[in-house]
C-alpha cells in the first residue's frame, strides 16, 4: 500500500514538474527515445544556424562587392562623359582640357581606392590574400593572383573561397580583382600595349599594370600633350569596353546574391521545421497536462483516504 502511495506521489510530482518546465522529460532516463531525438534535433538546428550565419556573411561580402562594382561603373561613366565632351569639341580650350585631365586623374585615384575596398577588415578583390590591398598607390598590382585552375597542376587553383551554406552546398563569395581591372603588357619604355581584347583571365603578378588603370593613364597623358582624335576615340572605346566588363561581373555577383537569398529563405524554413519537431518531441500540452495533474491529484488523495481507512487504529491500539 505504501509503495502504491509513493508511486502515485511520484507520478504527481513528475506531472507537476512537466507543467512547471513545459518539458516532457528532465533526464534521458525519463524518455530515452525522446531524449535521443531531441539531441539529434538540437544538433541539426546548430548546423542550420551555422549555415545561416555563413549565408549572412556571404551576402554581406557580396553586397559590398556589388556596391564597389557599381561605384567603378559610375567612375567609368563619368570618365566617358568627359571624354565625349573632348571628342565633340565641347571642351577644347587648354584650361578646359587641363580641368578634364585633373578630374580624370582624380577618378583614377578613386579607382585605386575602390580596388582596395575591404569588408570586415578583409580586402574583397585580393583573392586569398585578404590581408593585403589589391593595388599599390601607383596603380600597379600589389599582389600575385591565380585567376584560374591549371589543369596540369592540381595545386594551382583560382583564389576563390567558398562558404558552406548547406549539406554539400557551397557558394563562391569573392570576385578576383583581375576580373575587374584586367592586366596589360608594357613595352620597353614602360608604355602600355593596348590590344583588341583586354586580358581579364590570366594570372596576375605583383607590379603588373591593371588594364583599367592604364586606360586612365593613357587618356590623362593625351590630355596633357594634346588631343589626337584617334587616341581620344580609342579611349572612348576602351572606357565602353571596361564598363561592359564591369557590368558583366556585377551581373554575376547579382545572380549569386539572388541564389543566396533563396538559400537563406530555405535555411530559415528548415530551422522552423526542426524547431517544430523539437517542440512536438519535448514540449508538453498545457491543457492536457493540467487535466492529467487534476486526475493524478484525485488518485493520490483517494489512495491516501483509502490507506487511512485501512490502517485506522482502534482505541485500544491508540491507548497502548
Label the predicted regions.
Residues 12, 16-19, 23, 115-245, ...:
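Polar, low-complexity export/assembly segments characteristic of proteins
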Residues 1-131, 221-320:
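Amphipathic alpha-helical polymerization modules
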Amino acid at each position: 500500500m505504501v509503495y502504491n502511495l509513493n508511486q502515485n506521489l511520484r507520478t504527481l510530482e513528475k506531472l507537476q514538474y512537466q507543467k512547471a518546465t513545459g518539458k516532457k522529460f528532465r533526464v534521458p532516463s525519463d524518455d530515452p527515445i525522446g531524449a535521443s531525438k531531441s539531441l539529434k534535433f538540437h544538433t541539426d538546428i546548430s548546423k542550420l544556424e551555422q549555415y545561416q550565419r555563413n549565408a549572412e556573411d556571404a551576402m554581406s561580402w557580396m553586397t559590398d562587392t556589388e556596391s564597389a562594382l557599381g561605384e567603378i561603373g559610375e567612375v567609368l561613366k563619368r570618365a566617358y562623359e568627359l571624354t565625349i565632351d573632348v571628342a565633340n569639341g565641347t571642351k577644347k580650350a587648354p584650361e578646359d582640357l587641363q580641368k578634364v585631365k585633373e578630374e580624370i586623374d582624380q577618378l583614377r585615384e578613386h579607382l585605386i581606392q575602390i580596388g582596395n575596398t575591404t569588408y570586415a577588415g578583409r580586402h574583397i578583390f585580393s583573392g586569398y590574400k585578404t590581408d593585403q590591398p589589391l593595388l599599390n598607390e601607383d596603380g600597379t598590382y600589389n599582389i600575385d593572383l591565380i585567376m584560374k585552375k591549371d589543369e596540369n597542376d592540381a595545386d594551382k587553383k583560382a583564389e576563390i573561397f567558398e562558404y558552406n551554406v548547406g549539406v554539400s552546398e557551397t557558394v563562391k563569395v569573392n570576385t578576383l580583382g583581375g576580373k575587374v581591372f584586367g592586366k596589360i603588357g608594357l613595352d620597353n619604355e614602360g608604355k602600355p600595349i593596348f590590344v583588341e581584347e583586354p586580358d581579364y583571365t590570366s594570372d596576375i603578378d605583383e607590379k603588373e599594370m591593371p588594364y583599367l588603370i592604364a586606360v586612365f593613364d593613357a587618356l590623362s597623358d593625351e590630355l596633357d600633350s594634346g588631343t589626337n582624335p584617334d587616341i581620344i576615340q580609342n579611349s572612348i572605346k576602351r572606357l565602353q569596353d571596361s564598363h561592359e566588363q564591369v557590368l558583366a561581373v556585377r551581373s554575376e555577383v547579382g545572380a549569386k546574391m539572388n541564389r543566396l537569398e533563396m538559400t537563406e529563405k530555405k535555411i530559415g524554413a528548415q530551422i522552423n521545421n526542426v524547431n517544430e519537431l523539437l517542440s512536438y518531441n519535448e514540449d508538453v500540452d498545457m491543457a492536457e497536462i493540467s487535466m492529467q495533474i487534476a486526475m493524478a491529484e484525485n488518485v493520490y488523495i483517494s489512495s491516501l483516504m483509502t490507506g487511512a481507512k485501512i490502517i485506522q487504529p482502534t482505541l485500544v491500539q491508540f491507548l497502548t
